[in-house]
Amino acid sequence: HTNPPVVAEPKWDSPQTKEMFYRVCGNCHSNTTTWPWYSSIAPVSWLISHDVDEGREHFNVSMWGAQKVNKGHDAAEELREGEMPPWFYVIGHPEAKLPDSEKAQFIQGLTATFGGGK
């Protein structure tokens, strides 16, 4: 597995939002994926690679401004509605499950950074 170079990042509203993003979302939505040991064992490796590739294609903060479509404006809404992070990711990455107070702060930070939200 590889991590392409970081081309550009968004202007984060705060260091806290950036830290939470990389803790909760960064493994699939950036080029700084931390590949777990089991990501080298088939068939799990295929699933993980597919999920990371799909996540990067949909929304990648390491390619900020370089993608034709960058769905940053959807990030807060998807987190609020429980669509992200996926349940199967949280099982293996308990740090991605935020307490309600931290989740509210993160949603505000995402909205301030990317726009959108409700």
Residues of each region from the PLM?
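Electrostatic cytochrome c docking/interface patches
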Residues: 1-21
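Polytopic transmembrane helical bundles with strong interfacial aromatic enrichment
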Residues: 1-2, 60, 114-118
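Extracytoplasmic/secreted proteins, especially bacterial periplasmic and envelope-associated proteins
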Residues: 16, 20, 43, 47, ...
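Acidic helix-start/capping segments at beta-turn-to-alpha-helix junctions
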Residues: 35-50
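Extracytoplasmic electron-transfer domains, predominantly the class I c-type cytochrome c fold
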Residues: 46-94
